[in-house]
């Protein structure tokens, strides 16, 4: 889904920009912080598939071009140049395994990119990667996505998906990232997996996406 794809993205670029002791900080604070002089408008919702022609494009091609968008931003240029093949392989895998066409799983996000930025200041206040994101506005995507059934519904990691230019140490950390939670649903027509993106997990009875217990205070 788009959300855990974004987390995967942030990790790879962050790995290059920061030392390992700072990796956990990179996953937080994806806001339009004051350490960037200007921020682009929020882009269109990025999604895997569906009737909209935009959603049939690659991840990078769904981002708006020019200064009003994120496609040519330094963050995404580095990402595409260094790991473009890996990301296309990963995104194609998600697209192929997801059968839901409507946005779901709390996975569809919008991006905004900062310009004239610096990294001075507390890591909890600044946005060190200059990319902000938010859940797609005005869309109810609380239902867990329907995905192709796989034993135990553990869709990731998948060693069959090739990720060129990803080092072994990076691969190990990516494989352990908890960015997708899935549970089985057994239907008369056949079993499927129901999935939500971090920080959500599917309720095994209602298949609604709920905040993970350690985040909801339960």
Curated annotation (Swiss-Prot):
It comes from Caenorhabditis elegans. InterPro entries: T19C3.2-like (IPR040271). This is Uncharacterized protein T19C3.2.
């Amino acid at each position: 889904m788009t959300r855990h794809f974004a987390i995967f993205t942030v990790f790879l670029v962050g790995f290059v920009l920061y030392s390992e002791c700072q990796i956990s900080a990179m996953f937080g604070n994806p806001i339009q912080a004051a350490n960037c002089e200007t921020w682009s408008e929020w882009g269109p919702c990025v999604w895997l598939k569906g009737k909209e022609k935009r959603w049939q494009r690659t991840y990078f091609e769904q981002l708006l071009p020019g200064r009003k968008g994120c496609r040519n931003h330094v963050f995404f240029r580095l990402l595409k140049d260094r790991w473009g093949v890996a990301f296309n392989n990963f995104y194609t895998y998600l697209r192929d395994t997801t059968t839901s066409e409507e946005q779901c799983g709390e996975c569809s996000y919008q991006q905004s990119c900062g310009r004239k930025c610096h990294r001075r200041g507390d890591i909890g206040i600044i946005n060190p990667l200059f990319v902000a994101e938010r859940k797609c506005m005005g869309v109810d995507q609380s239902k867990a996505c329907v995905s192709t059934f796989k034993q135990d519904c553990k869709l990731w990691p998948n060693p069959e998906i090739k990720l060129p230019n990803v080092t072994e140490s990076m691969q190990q950390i990516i494989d352990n990232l908890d960015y997708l939670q899935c549970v089985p649903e057994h239907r008369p027509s056949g079993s499927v997996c129901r999935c939500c993106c971090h920080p959500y997990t599917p309720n095994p009875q209602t298949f609604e996406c709920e905040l993970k217990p350690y985040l909801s205070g339960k």
